C-alpha cells in the first residue's frame, strides 16, 4: 500500500553509484538506519550487474529494506520486480507503458518519470501512484539525464495534478532541498548526495530536517 510519506526521502542507487571504498549493502544499511523512507534499486550504466548477480543483489536489498519496513522499488526491470516480489516498480517515459504491466502489479507501488507538461499530458496516470519530476538541477548521477527543469516545473505541474504525489529528482542536495519542497514536492529523490557523503547519517539527518 502506497503512502505519499514514503516519498519524503527516497534513496536511489545501484552498484555503479558506490565508491570503491565501501559496498552497496553497507551504504543502504546505513541509509536505512538513518531514516530513508523508500529505496529504489537502479542498476544501470558502466559496470552494472546483470543476470543472476543482479537478481541476487536485489533479493538481498529487498530483505534488508523489509527489515526496516521501507518499500523496495525496482527501476525499469519489470521482470525482476515481478520475480522477486518487489514492493513496486519505477519506469521512465521510454520504458514499457504502465498499463501493459499494471495488472501484474496490483497492490504494488508504481512510479513514472515526467519532465515537462507535454509528458504529463501524454501519460496515463490511472495506474500510477506517484510521479518523479526532474532533473531539478544539473546531475552527474545519470548519463541519460535531460536538461534541468528546475523546481518551477513542480509548481507548473501542481496546477494540473492537484494533490497527486510528486517526488523531485536530480542534483538535489541539503542546500537546495527547501526550495524544491516549497515548489510543491512531497519529497526528494537522492543518489550521489548520499552515496558520496562522508557521513551518511549526518547527511540524511539534514535532509530529513529540510523536507519537513
UniProtKB/Swiss-Prot annotation:
GO terms for cellular component: cytoplasm. This is Thiamine-phosphate synthase. Keywords: Magnesium, Metal-binding, Thiamine biosynthesis, Transferase. GO terms for biological process: thiamine biosynthetic process; thiamine diphosphate biosynthetic process. InterPro entries: Aldolase_TIM, ThiamineP_synth_sf, ThiamineP_synth_TenI, TMP_synthase. It is an enzyme of class 2 (transferase). Pathway: Cofactor biosynthesis; thiamine diphosphate biosynthesis; thiamine phosphate from 4-amino-2-methyl-5-diphosphomethylpyrimidine and 4-methyl-5-(2-phosphoethyl)-thiazole: step 1/1. The gene is thiE. Mg(2+) binds at residues 76, 95. Its cofactor is Mg(2+). Binds 1 Mg(2+) ion per subunit. The keyword Ligase does not apply. Condenses 4-methyl-5-(beta-hydroxyethyl)thiazole monophosphate (THZ-P) and 2-methyl-4-amino-5-hydroxymethyl pyrimidine pyrophosphate (HMP-PP) to form thiamine monophosphate (TMP). Belongs to the thiamine-phosphate synthase family. HAMAP family: TMP_synthase (MF_00097). It catalyses: 2-[(2R,5Z)-2-carboxy-4-methylthiazol-5(2H)-ylidene]ethyl phosphate + 4-amino-2-methyl-5-(diphosphooxymethyl)pyrimidine + 2 H(+) = thiamine phosphate + CO2 + diphosphate; 2-(2-carboxy-4-methylthiazol-5-yl)ethyl phosphate + 4-amino-2-methyl-5-(diphosphooxymethyl)pyrimidine + 2 H(+) = thiamine phosphate + CO2 + diphosphate; 4-methyl-5-(2-phosphooxyethyl)-thiazole + 4-amino-2-methyl-5-(diphosphooxymethyl)pyrimidine + H(+) = thiamine phosphate + diphosphate. 2-[(2R,5Z)-2-carboxy-4-methylthiazol-5(2H)-ylidene]ethyl phosphate binds at residues 139-141, 171, 191-192. It comes from the Bacteria. 4-amino-2-methyl-5-(diphosphooxymethyl)pyrimidine binds at residues 40-44, 75, 113, 142.
